[in-house]
UniProtKB/Swiss-Prot annotation:
GO molecular function, a single term: nutrient reservoir activity
InterPro entries reported for this sequence: Seed_Storage_Prolamin, Zein
Functional description taken from the UniProt entry: Major seed storage prolamin.
Presence of keyword GTP-binding: no
Pfam families in the record: Zein
Family (UniProt): Belongs to the zein family.
Annotated signal peptide: 1-19
Keywords on record: Seed storage protein, Signal, Storage protein
Protein name: Kafirin PSK8
């Protein structure tokens, strides 16, 4: 019996040193051993299976951590690429908007220089950039205080679409409408003088050929009672003489040369 007991103990010892089974069960003694044995002896007496499991755990942790770091790097690189492309797109859009704005400004400068200058003043003034409506109102008030006539003309030009397309023609029409009552009174009082005055409204070619005669004709304008009574008539007549073409010189050149004399007789 003693011999069998010794053989059984020997078999247990041999199987304990060579066994590589049940790693979960081997963890419990491994946790208990360091309480009674120093760490060096515990590490030396640790089973090979436990060492293999620990090595496997360390390797698996390192393998799992590497893809996470790589994914983070790829994600950061993707974010940087997206930000760079977004900034480039924003810059391209800003450049396109600037080009469109410059083209519209050039077209506005060709069509309406006054509006172009006002827009340039708005962009150059920081107060106008902060509040363009208040700045425009302030400018309009200053214009109304400095020159009420120009302010009224500007308001009429802004309110009338025909005036926006052709401001000069619109102003001439407004001036003509203002002097229509005076002209109608002249036509009723003296039809001959009215017809002669209508013939003298276009530009006098003699002013280009003979400046002295034209100046004499202009000096005789204040003698006209109609001009003295209504200064707008004088301004309108002068404007018409300087802005339109004399049809009389085409039909009858002799009458065109006599035109200053007729004007002196009338005025």
């Amino acid at each position: 019996t003693k011999i069998f007991a010794l053989l059984a103990l020997h078999a247990l010892l041999v199987s304990g040193t060579t066994a590589a089974i049940i790693p979960q069960c081997s963890l419990a003694p491994n946790a208990i051993i360091p309480q009674f044995i120093p760490p060096v002896t515990a590490l030396g007496n640790e089973h090979l299976a436990v060492q293999a499991i620990r090595l496997q755990q360390v390797l698996s942790a390192s393998i799992l951590q590497q893809p996470i770091a790589q994914l983070q790097q790829h994600f950061l690189a993707h974010l940087t690429v997206q930000t760079i492309t977004r900034r480039r797109q924003q810059q391209q859009q800003q450049q396109q908007q600037q080009q469109q704005f410059l083209s519209s400004l050039s077209a506005l400068a060709v069509r309406n220089q006054a509006a172009y200058l006002q827009q340039q003043l708005l962009t150059s003034n920081p107060h106008s950039l902060a509040n363009a409506a208040a700045y425009q109102q302030q400018q309009q008030l200053q214009l109304a205080m400095a020159n009420p006539t120009a302010y009224v003309q500007q308001q009429l030009l802004l309110s009338n679409p025909q005036a926006a397309t052709n401001a000069a023609t619109y102003l001439q029409q407004q001036q003509f409408q203002q002097i229509l009552p005076a002209l109608s009174q002249l036509a009723m009082a003296n039809p001959t003088a009215y017809l002669q005055q209508q013939q003298l409204l276009p530009i006098n070619q003699l002013a280009l050929a003979n400046t002295d005669a034209y100046l004499q004709q202009q000096q005789l304008l204040p003698v006209n009672p109609l001009v003295v009574a209504n200064p707008l008539v004088a301004a309108f007549l002068q404007q018409q003489q300087l802005s339109s073409f004399n049809q009389i010189s085409l039909v009858n050149p002799a009458l065109s040369w006599q035109q200053p004399i007729i004007g002196g007789a009338i005025f």
